[in-house]
Design a protein with these regions (language model features):
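A feature for loop-to-transmembrane-helix boundaries and adjacent hydrophobic helices
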Residues: 1-189
Length: 189
């Protein structure tokens, strides 16, 4: 990231344009990173889900609904009462929501939306702001089925990621408003 900023500054490029150009790639990279989370089973998964796949989506592979994270290095109990964590810290049974897979799919969709919007949206800064909104909304809702600590803020329960996601959405919406207002002002000047 720093090298991109340094290069852009050295070449006199507008940072807003650089951020807009980077937004689709950031979302794509996030999705690729989540593939690693899914494959490694590193504890970045959802809550226990030992339910049968609903008939309406039974055409999908079972692992898209409920996944057995064989590499449960966190030793999280995935919902089988009385099942011990192995002495090596791994748990070899129990299924969970495959949230890294869901995030991969959403990240690729968002990256596609940002990529195909880049030529239609002419206002600098709006693509970056859209990235913040879409990524924040995606992360907020995926946290609803993920294992994480909740914090009590102003009487509301939220995970750290949800708090950050709300901030991303707020800053993204403010950014869209600001950049469009700025472009209109410059157009009339």
């Amino acid at each position: 990231g720093g090298s991109v900023l340094y290069y852009a500054h050295k070449k006199g490029l507008s940072m807003v344009h650089v951020f807009d150009a980077c937004a689709p790639g950031l979302m794509l990279a996030y999705g690729i990173g989540r593939i690693g989370c899914q494959l490694s089973g590193d504890g970045d998964w959802g809550m226990p889900n030992n339910n049968e796949i609903p008939a309406i989506i039974s055409f999908l592979p079972d692992w898209m609904w409920s996944f057995d994270y064989f590499g449960n290095i966190s030793g999280v109990d995935l919902g089988a009462p009385g099942r011990p964590v192995m002495s090596d810290g791994y748990m070899y049974e129990g299924n969970a929501w495959p949230t890294p897979f869901y995030e991969t799919v959403m990240a690729f969709i968002i990256a596609g939306i940002l990529w195909f919007s880049r030529k239609k949206i002419k206002v600098p800064g709006v693509i970056l702001s859209m990235y913040l909104v879409f990524n924040g909304v995606e992360r907020f809702f995926i946290e609803k089925i993920r294992i994480n600590n909740n914090y009590n803020m102003f009487g509301l329960e939220a995970t750290q990621a949800q708090i950050i996601a709300v901030a991303m959405v707020v800053f993204g919406l403010l950014g869209i408003w600001y950049f469009i207002k700025k472009a209109k002002k410059e157009a009339t000047a």
